């Protein structure tokens, strides 16, 4: 079963992209390649129970088991040893990627307090988009009573477009809410 966001991309977004931008080849049409969700452990890297909890929580949110990221060198001021766990990362592709993006757009972002849209300045110049979330409570899969600590995550959407304009158009047509800055 195809995800509804992928069906929308194939049926409506691709023709609109072809109409607005000129492409000589079908492979030049921008598409989302992967979504990477990264979550740092902060002070929790010393406690293995909270570390396992963060790993399970991220797998519930994304539908895929994460991998552990380790420190490359020791930093004494952070009480960090070499090769100690410092974060959890998940890379989503294919159907799970579209399912997560659909849940992010339609369920999680509207639940953010005082949400007025995502900032257009979060593009990196090559068409990739990054956003940071302050808490995990916005996802409906998370049970409020079972949370050890509130912490956020970084989400990077990798798009194979050469510039920010095409990526912004693609994400806007998929339904990602961007803020409209009014110049006064």
From Swiss-Prot:
This protein's name: Large ribosomal subunit protein uL5c
Role summary: Binds 5S rRNA, forms part of the central protuberance of the 50S subunit.
Gene name of the encoded protein: rpl5
GO biological-process terms attached to the record: translation
PANTHER family in the record: 60S RIBOSOMAL PROTEIN L11-RELATED (PTHR11994)
NCBIfam families membership: PRK00010.1 (NF000585)
Keyword Electron transport: no
Pfam family membership, one: Ribosomal_L5
Swiss-Prot/TrEMBL keywords: Chloroplast, Plastid, Ribonucleoprotein, Ribosomal protein, RNA-binding, rRNA-binding
Lineage of source species: Eukaryota, Sar, Rhizaria, Cercozoa, Chlorarachniophyceae
One GO cellular component, as annotated: ribonucleoprotein complex
One of the record's GO molecular function terms: structural constituent of ribosome
Subunit annotation: Part of the 50S ribosomal subunit; contacts the 5S rRNA.
Domain of life of the native organism: Eukaryota
Database matches in InterPro entries: Ribosomal_uL5, Ribosomal_uL5_bac-type, Ribosomal_uL5_C, Ribosomal_uL5_CS, Ribosomal_uL5_dom_sf, Ribosomal_uL5_N
Record localization: Plastid, Chloroplast
Main subcellular location of this protein, as a coarse class: plastid
Family to which the UniProt record says this protein belongs: Belongs to the universal ribosomal protein uL5 family.
Source species of the chain: Bigelowiella natans (Pedinomonas minutissima)
